[in-house]
Amino acid sequence: MWLTRVRSLARRAPFRIVRPSPPIHRYFYNFRPPQLCFLCACLEETRDVPGSIAEVGCAQGQTAVFLNLYMEFRQIEKPYIAVDTFSGFVPEDVAFEIEHRGKPPGLIAGFENNRKEWFDESMRANGIRRVQSIQADVNRLDLTSLGPLALCLLDVDLYRPMSKALRELYEVLSPGGLLVVDDCDPANVRWDGADQAYQEFTASRGLPYQVVHGKLGLVRKPA
C-alpha cells in the first residue's frame, strides 16, 4: 500500500531537473598577465646574479606561488624571502598619507584579512619549500638584512614605507640585480605615493625613471 502511495505522489510532484552549478573561474592575481610574464623575464635576467629573490609586500601569496612555481619549472635555485605585515597597512603610514599627502580618510585601506599562517599554508599546499616568510613592518625592519639580493619585487603601495625600502634594498642589490617597484602610476590617486617615492629615489641616484607595463618601475644596479 505504501509503495502505491509513493508512486502516486511521485507522479503528481512537479518534475524538476537539478543541474550542477558550473565552475566559475575568476582571475585572482594582482598583476595582469603581461606583468606576470615580465616578472618571469626578470627571474631569467637575474638567474646568474648572486643573491636571493625578495618580495616585499606579498599580501596573501598569489604572486609568490606563481613565481616560485616558475622558478621550479625553470630550475632557478635561489632562496625566496617574502615580507609583509600580514595584517594590512600600519596606522602611521595611513596617517602620513592623510596628513602630508592630502588623502581623504577611508581611501587607504585593504589587505587586513590576512595571516602569516595562511600565507605559509599556501606555500605548503603548492609544494613550495624555499620561501622564508617574515612578518614585519617595513618601517621597522632593517631591509639590508635581506641581502644580497638578485631580484626584488617591492609592493608596499604607500609613500613612507616605499621611500625607506627603496634606499635599503638598493644598498644590498647585487651588481646586475633588478628592483621592480609596483604601483608607479601617478594617475592612481590611491597608490600614487609609490610613484612619488620612486621618482624621488631615481632622481637622487641619477638613475633613469623607467616604468613598464603601466605601473612597474625598474631600478637596475650597474654590473
What are these regions (language model features)?
Residues M1-A10, P14:
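Boundary detector for helix-to-coil junctions that initiate low-complexity/charged tails
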